[in-house]
C-alpha cells in the first residue's frame, strides 16, 4: 500500500511543471507578437518617410528620419529596411530614387558586416537602375558603386586574402559586364562609368583582380556592337592610375585605342587621346618600348577638325614623344630648321645685295638702266615682264637671282643711253652741249604724241642725258666720239626707232578714226534727243490747247443748257449740283458723268480737287435750299444781288443779250461758231494751251460767248461779288490755304458755293480753324437731310468722328446745340435714306452712336 501512496505522492509535483511550460509558451508568443507589431510599425514609419522624399517641403525632414532609422537598425530589421529601399527604387519620382540609392551606401557604411551578405542583391538593384532615363539617377548609381567599392575593396591580396578579394571584385564586375552586353547605349555607358568609379574608389585596389579586366575590356573595345566605347575608355585610364594594366594585354589594348582614335565619333576620339595621356602619365614603364606606333597614329590625328580632340591629341603626343626620347630631338630639329631658314635668308640677302651691286655697276657703265630708271621708265622692258616680277616677288625670296636673265631682258628693249657728265672747260664744250640739248629736245618733241609704249627721253638739269636716234653723230660731243656708249646699241636703236615710228603712225590713224566715230555718234545722239524733246514739247503744247478748247466748248454748252432749262421750267430743281449734270454726254468733260459721287476712300481726307470742277461753280439761285426753306445764313449782299438779278438770270450777259435774244434762249450754234473765230476766243484758247491744264477757276467770270461776240460793255461792268468770292477761294486753294478758301465762301453766305467747295476739296476739317470748322459743320447739319448731298455729309461726318476720337470731345469747340442738331439730323437721315452704293466707310448708324458716345449725348432724348 505504501507503493501506491508513494507513487501517488510522487506524481503530484508534475502538474506545476505543465503549467510552467504553458506560461513560458504564452510569454514567447506574446513576445513574438510584440516584435512583429514593432516590425510593422517600423516598416510603416520607413515607408512614410520615403514617401515624404517626393515633396521638396518635407524632403530634408524625411532624410533625417531615415538616417536616424538606419543608425538604430538591428541585424533583424536590416533586411526589412533594405527591401523597403529596393521597392522605393522603382518610384516614378527621380528624387526618391536618387535618395534611396544614397541610403543604400549609407546603410552599408554603418552596417558593413551585416550588409556583406546582401551585397550581391544590392549591386544588382543598383545596376537595374542604370536603365533609368534620368541621368541624375544614373549618376547616383555610379556614386553608390564607388562608395561600396571604397567599403568592401579594402583588403590587399596577400596570402589567403587573394580569394576573398577576387570574390569581392567579381561581385561588382559580373553584373556590370552583363549590363555592358545589352544592346542599349545608355545602359552600357552607365555600367562603364560605374566600373571606372569602382576602380578609382577602391581603397586598397586588388591589382591582380583588376588586371583580369583588361582582356574583357579589349574585347569590348574591338566589338563593333559595343556602343559606349567613349565611356569604357576611362576604365582603362582608371586601371592605369592604380597600376592594374597587365603587360600581356598592353599590345592589344593599344591596338583597340588606336582604332578608337579613328572613330567617327569625336567624343570617342577625345576619350582615346585622354586614355593615351593617362597611360603615358601612369604606366610609362610599360609603354616605353612600344611608342612608335602610337606616335605615328597620334601624328595622323593631330590635325583633327574638332578643337577639344586636337588639344587632347597634342597633349598625348607630347607625353609619348617625351617617353620615347624624341621630344628633345624634335626641339633640336626645330632649332636646326629655324637656323637653316635664317642661314637661307642671309644667303638670299647676300644674293640680293650682289644683284643690286651688279645693276649699279651696269648702270655706271651705261649699258643698262639704273634701279631708279628701271622702276620709273615704261620703255626699259615690257609691262608684262614687270607684272610677272611683281607677282613672283614673294617666291624670289627663297630662290637665287639670275643676273644674266635681267641683262638679256633689259638689253632686248633698251634704247636709252646714259651720257656721263663732263666739266665745262671752254666755250667750245659748252656750245657742243647746247647742240646736244637742242637735238634731244627736238627728238622729245617728236615723241610727245606717242602712246605709253613709246620711248621717252630723259634729261637732267645740266643736259647730261640725251636720246640717240640712230645717228652716230648723236654720241659725239665737242668733236669727239664718246667711247663705249652708243656703239653697242646703234643698230638696235635704228631698228627700234623705225618700228616705233611705224607703230606710232598706225596708232595715230586708228586713234583719229575712233575719235571721229565718237564725235559722229555723239552728234547723232544729240540730234535724236533734241528731236524727241521737241516732239514731246509739241505734244504737250497740243494737248494743253485741246484741253483748253474742250473747256471753252464745255462752258458754251453749259450756258446753252442753263438757258434752255430756264425756258422750260424756271423753278425746276437742278441735278446733282447744276443742270449740266444731266447733260447727255461726257465727251467734253474731264470726267465721266456721276464721277463726283465716287468716293474710293471712306475718309476722303486730303482728296485732290479736280481742275475741271473749278470752272462749273455756278449754281442757280432758285435751288438755294434743298428742303424747301431759305438758307439760314444768306448775307445781305448776296440777297441784294439775287434780287437785282433774279428777273433776268444770274449771268450779266443775259441782261446785255436781252435785246437780241429772247428770254430763255441762248446764242445759236451758228453765232457760237462765228464767235469762236474772234480774236478774244482764239487768245483764250492760246492761253489755255500755255497753262498746261492748270486749273483756272476765274475763266468763267464772264461768259466766253459774250467775250467772243465782242460785248465790250462787259469790261466796264462791275464784277459779280459771288464770282469774286469764288475766285478768291480758288486762289486760296491753289496756294494750299483751305481755311481761307472756306472763310471766303462762308462769308459770301451762298450755300451752293459751300456745297461746290466741299465737293471739290473733300473733308478738310483738320485744316480749318475752330470758327470756320463750326460754320462748315452748321452747313453740314442742314445738308444731311438732302438726299443728293448725303454722300458728302457722310464723308465729312466720318472725318469729324475721326478727329473727335483722336483729339477729344472738345475738338473745334462745337457748341452743344450744334452737336445735338448734327446728331438729330444724321439719325433722321439714317432712318430715311440709305448710304450710297459706293460708300466704303462705317455705317451711318455707327457714326451716330460713336459721335453720341464721345459727345456724351443720350440718343433716347431724340425719340422722346
From Swiss-Prot:
* Protein's job: Plant-specific microtubule-associated protein (MAP) that regulates the orientation of cortical microtubules and the direction of organ growth. Determines microtubule organization by modulating microtubule severing.
Q: Name one Pfam family in it.
A: TOR1L1_N
Sequence ranges of Polar residues compositional bias:
17-26, 439-448, 489-504
Q: How does it assemble?
A: Interacts with WAV3.
Location (main, coarse):
cytoplasm
Q: Does the keyword Iron-sulfur apply?
A: no
| Region entry Disordered, spans | 1-26, 329-353, 426-504, 615-670
Q: What is this protein called?
A: Microtubule-associated protein TORTIFOLIA1
MF annotations from Gene Ontology: microtubule binding
Name its cellular compartments: Cytoplasm, Cytoskeleton
Phenotype of null mutants? Right-handed twisting of petioles. Enhanced twisting when associated with SP2L disruption.
Which gene carries the instructions for this protein?
Answer: TOR1
* Tissue expression: Expressed in roots, hypocotyls, stems, flowers, siliques, inflorescences, petioles, cotyledons, and leaves. Particularly present in root tips and shoot meristems.
Modified residues annotated as Phosphoserine in this record: 414
Amino acid at each position: 500500500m505504501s507503493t501506491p501512496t508513494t507513487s501517488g505522492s510522487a506524481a503530484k509535483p508534475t502538474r506545476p511543471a505543465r503549467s510552467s511550460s504553458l506560461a513560458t509558451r504564452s510569454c514567447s508568443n506574446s513576445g513574438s507578437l510584440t516584435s512583429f507589431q514593432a516590425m510593422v510599425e517600423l516598416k510603416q514609419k520607413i515607408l512614410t518617410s520615403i514617401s515624404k522624399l517626393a515633396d521638396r517641403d518635407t524632403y530634408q525632414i524625411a532624410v533625417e528620419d531615415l538616417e536616424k532609422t538606419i543608425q538604430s537598425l538591428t541585424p533583424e530589421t536590416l533586411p526589412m529596411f533594405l527591401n523597403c529601399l529596393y521597392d522605393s527604387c522603382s518610384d516614378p519620382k527621380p528624387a526618391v530614387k536618387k535618395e534611396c540609392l544614397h541610403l543604400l551606401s549609407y546603410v552599408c557604411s554603418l552596417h558593413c558586416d551585416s550588409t556583406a551578405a546582401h551585397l550581391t542583391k544590392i549591386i544588382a538593384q543598383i545596376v537595374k537602375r542604370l536603365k533609368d532615363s534620368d541621368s541624375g539617377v544614373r549618376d547616383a548609381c555610379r556614386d553608390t558603386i564607388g562608395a561600396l567599392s571604397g567599403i568592401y575593396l579594402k583588403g590587399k591580396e596577400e596570402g589567403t586574402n587573394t580569394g576573398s578579394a577576387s570574390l569581392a571584385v567579381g561581385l561588382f564586375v559580373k553584373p556590370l559586364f552583363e549590363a555592358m552586353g545589352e544592346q542599349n547605349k545608355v545602359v552600357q555607358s552607365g555600367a562603364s562609368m560605374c566600373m571606372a568609379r569602382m576602380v578609382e574608389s577602391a581603397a586598397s585596389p586588388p591589382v591582380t583582380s583588376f588586371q583580369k579586366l583588361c582582356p574583357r575590356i579589349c574585347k569590348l573595345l574591338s566589338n563593333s556592337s559595343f556602343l559606349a566605347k567613349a565611356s569604357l575608355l576611362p576604365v582603362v585610364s582608371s586601371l592605369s592610375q592604380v597600376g592594374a594594366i597587365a603587360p600581356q594585354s598592353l599590345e592589344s589594348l593599344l591596338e583597340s585605342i588606336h582604332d578608337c582614335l579613328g572613330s567617327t565619333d569625336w567624343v570617342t576620339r577625345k576619350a582615346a587621346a585622354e586614355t593615351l595621356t593617362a597611360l603615358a602619365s601612369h604606366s610609362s614603364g610599360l609603354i616605353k618600348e612600344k611608342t612608335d606606333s602610337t606616335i605615328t597614329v597620334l601624328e595622323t590625328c593631330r590635325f583633327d577638325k574638332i578643337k577639344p580632340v586636337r588639344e587632347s591629341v597634342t597633349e598625348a603626343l607630347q607625353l609619348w614623344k617625351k617617353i620615347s626620347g624624341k621630344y628633345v630631338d624634335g626641339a633640336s630639329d626645330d632649332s636646326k630648321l629655324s637656323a637653316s631658314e635664317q642661314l637661307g635668308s642671309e644667303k638670299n640677302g647676300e644674293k640680293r645685295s650682289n644683284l643690286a651691286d651688279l645693276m649699279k655697276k651696269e648702270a655706271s657703265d651705261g649699258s643698262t638702266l639704273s634701279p631708279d630708271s628701271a622702276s620709273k621708265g615704261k620703255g626699259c622692258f615690257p609691262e608684262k615682264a614687270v607684272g610677272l616680277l611683281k607677282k613672283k616677288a614673294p617666291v624670289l625670296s627663297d630662290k637665287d637671282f639670275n643676273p644674266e636673265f635681267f641683262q638679256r631682258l633689259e638689253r632686248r628693249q633698251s634704247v636709252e643711253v646714259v651720257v656721263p657728265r663732263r666739266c665745262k672747260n671752254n666755250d667750245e664744250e659748252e656750245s657742243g652741249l647746247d647742240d646736244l640739248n637742242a637735238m634731244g629736245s627736238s627728238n622729245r618733241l617728236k615723241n610727245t604724241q606717242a602712246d605709253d609704249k613709246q620711248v621717252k627721253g630723259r634729261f637732267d638739269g645740266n643736259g647730261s642725258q640725251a636720246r640717240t636716234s640712230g645717228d652716230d653723230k648723236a654720241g659725239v660731243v665737242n668733236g669727239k666720239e664718246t667711247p663705249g656708249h652708243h656703239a653697242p646699241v646703234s643698230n638696235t636703236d635704228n631698228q627700234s626707232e623705225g618700228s616705233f615710228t611705224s607703230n606710232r603712225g598706225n596708232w595715230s590713224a586708228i586713234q583719229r578714226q575712233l575719235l571721229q566715230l565718237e564725235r559722229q555718234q555723239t552728234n547723232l545722239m544729240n540730234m535724236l534727243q533734241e528731236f524727241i524733246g521737241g516732239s514731246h514739247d509739241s505734244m504737250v503744247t497740243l494737248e494743253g490747247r485741246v484741253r483748253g478748247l474742250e473747256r471753252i466748248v464745255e462752258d458754251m454748252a453749259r450756258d446753252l443748257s442753263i438757258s434752255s432749262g430756264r425756258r422750260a421750267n424756271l423753278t425746276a430743281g437742278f441735278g446733282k449740283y447744276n443742270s449740266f449734270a444731266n447733260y447727255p454726254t461726257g465727251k467734253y468733260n474731264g470726267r465721266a458723268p456721276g464721277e463726283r459721287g465716287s468716293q474710293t476712300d471712306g475718309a476722303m481726307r486730303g482728296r485732290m480737287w479736280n481742275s475741271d470742277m473749278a470752272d462749273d461753280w455756278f449754281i442757280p439761285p432758285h435751288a438755294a435750299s434743298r428742303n424747301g426753306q431759305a438758307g439760314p445764313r444768306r448775307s445781305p449782299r448776296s440777297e441784294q444781288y439775287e434780287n437785282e438779278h433774279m428777273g433776268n438770270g444770274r449771268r450779266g450777259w443775259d441782261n446785255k443779250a436781252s435785246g437780241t435774244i429772247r428770254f430763255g434762249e441762248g446764242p445759236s450754234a451758228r453765232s457760237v461758231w462765228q464767235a469762236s473765230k474772234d480774236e478774244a476766243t482764239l487768245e483764250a484758247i492760246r492761253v489755255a494751251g500755255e497753262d498746261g491744264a492748270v486749273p483756272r477757276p476765274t475763266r468763267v467770270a464772264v461768259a466766253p460767248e459774250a467775250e467772243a461776240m465782242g460785248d465790250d460793255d462787259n469790261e466796264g461792268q462791275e464784277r459779280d461779288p459771288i464770282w469774286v468770292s469764288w475766285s478768291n477761294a480758288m486762289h486760296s486753294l491753289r496756294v494750299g490755304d483751305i481755311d481761307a478758301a472756306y472763310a471766303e465762301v462762308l462769308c459770301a453766305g451762298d450755300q451752293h458755293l459751300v456745297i461746290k467747295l466741299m465737293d471739290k476739296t473733300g473733308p478738310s476739317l483738320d485744316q480749318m480753324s475752330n470758327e470756320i470748322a463750326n460754320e462748315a459743320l452748321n452747313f453740314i447739319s442742314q445738308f444731311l437731310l438732302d438726299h443728293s448731298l448725303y454722300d458728302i455729309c457722310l464723308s465729312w461726318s466720318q472725318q469729324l468722328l475721326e478727329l473727335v476720337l483722336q483729339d477729344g470731345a472738345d475738338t473745334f469747340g462745337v457748341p452743344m446745340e450744334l452737336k445735338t442738331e448734327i446728331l438729330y439730323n444724321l439719325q433722321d437721315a439714317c432712318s430715311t435714306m440709305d448710304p450710297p452704293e459706293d460708300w466704303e466707310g462705317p455705317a451711318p448708324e455707327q457714326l451716330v452712336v460713336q459721335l453720341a458716345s464721345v459727345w456724351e449725348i443720350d440718343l433716347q432724348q431724340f425719340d422722346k
